[in-house]
Amino acid sequence: MKIKIKCFSQVKYTLGKDELNLELEFGTTTSKLEKLIREKADGKLDGVSLRVAVNQKYSPDETELNDGDEVAFIPPVQGG
């Protein structure tokens, strides 16, 4: 199945892209996808808390993805 991934902030800068298109196995969950993204980052996202949104709605870790879903990895907002 094809999934579009939107990257923001630290994820965007670490991966060097604001959007990825991946082909994943059916039954992949958001937590499995997060693990894959962290592996692609070679440890640079270790310790970074990420929120996951599927089709523009925050989703639990074990949400099963479907073909054509848009997934966003959103680090916490920081500011002063």
Language-model-detected regions and their locations in the chain:
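Ubiquitin-like/PB1-type beta-grasp interaction modules and other compact soluble beta-rich domains
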Residues: M1-G79
